Amino acid sequence: MKVKFETLGCKVNSYETDAMKKLFEDRGYSVTEDVADIYIINTCTVTNLSARKSRQFISRAQKENPDGLVAVVGCYSQTEPEVIEDLGVDIILGTQGRRSIVDLCEEALESKDQISLVKGLEKSRSFEELSIEDNFEKTRAYLKIQEGCNQFCTYCIIPYARGPIKSRDFDSVIKEAEKLAERGFKELVLTGIHASSYGRDTKTGLGLMDLIEGDAGVEGV
C-alpha cells in the first residue's frame, strides 16, 4: 500500500515525519507523492495561519482519494482534537504515540471506525523515541534531541501542544548520529522544541554542550 505524508511547521515536525516514514517502510509500505491509500498529515498550530493550512491539507487529502485513510497527528490535533474529529478523518493522534501509527492505520483500515487517541501532556515526562537512519530528499540530517517547553510565554501555545521538557537519552542521540554518519551525512542539525533546555530534566549532569561535543566526536561528522 502507498502512504503520502504532508508536513507543516518546524524542523521537529520534519524529523518526526521522516521517522514515521521509516516506520511504514519497515512494514513494507511505499512512500509516495502521488495518490495514496493512507495520508498522514503532520500538523502545526503555532499560528492561526498554520492551523488553517493544516485543515486545508486534510481537505485536500480527502478530495484526492475519497476512499483513502486520513490520519492527523501533531500540534494542531493535540490542542484541538474535537475540531479534527469533526473534519471526518480516520485517526486523530497528538504529539505522543507516533510509534504506533502503523498499527493504528491498520486497525482503522480493518474496523472503519474513527480512532482518537489524544492524551493530556501535563504529566508527560518520558521522551518518545523516534529515530531515523536516513533523511528523505535532504543532504544534511536533523536529529531530535529534546521535546517540550516549560516557558509558558503568554503568546505561545507550544507548551500545551508539546508538554513539559523531556530530554532524549544521551547515548540514544549518539547512536543515531553514528547511524546517520554511516549513511554519509557529514552535517547534523540538533533540533528540539526548546533545545537549549536539553538535560535540565535529567540527573545525568549532561547538557547541550556535552551533547554537541559528543556528536562532533562521531567519526564522519
Residue spans for each PLM region:
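Proteins enriched for Cys/Gly/acidic motifs involved in redox and nucleic-acid/cofactor modification
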Residues: 1-198, 213
